[in-house]
Design a protein with these regions (language model features):
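N-terminus-centered regions that define maturation/targeting leaders and the start
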Residues: 1-126
Length: 126
């Protein structure tokens, strides 16, 4: 699967608008290539450079398989609790230095098995 954002390219800096120092709104995302036997999608955004190894910024499950995008600040599926202890999106807010934020979209079949995956990496430093 191909996961992209019109707001930033892969391995590029995420605009401050989508971070804790900006408006803290989720960036727009779009994807293609969802496998035919997909029943739901899930999306996870993790800071892989966090002091504890990773920090979850967004956890979305039960996204309908026919969905091909999430608009800026949009809500689809069921949003879980992020690492800040709040439901929904929590923008990048690294304590120091540049951090990588991995957006991972998974396609799941009717048994919850992963049948496809797409990743997009953003970078940010305060």
């Amino acid at each position: 699967m191909n996961l992209t954002s019109p707001a930033f390219g892969n391995n590029q800096s995420i605009p401050a608008k989508y971070t804790c120092t900006g408006q803290n709104v989720s960036p727009p995302l779009q994807w293609t290539g969802v496998p035919p036997h997909t029943t739901t999608l899930s999306l996870m955004v993790d800071d892989t450079d966090a002091p504890g190894g990773h920090f979850t910024h967004w956890d979305v499950t039960q996204i309908p398989a026919a969905t091909t995008s999430i608009p800026e600040g949009g809500h689809v599926g069921v949003e879980g609790t992020n690492g800040f202890g709040k439901q929904g999106y929590g923008g990048p807010c690294p304590p120091s230095g540049e951090h990588r934020y991995v957006f991972t979209l998974k396609a799941l079949d009717e048994n919850g098995r992963e049948v496809g995956r797409g990743e997009l990496i953003a970078k940010y430093a305060k």
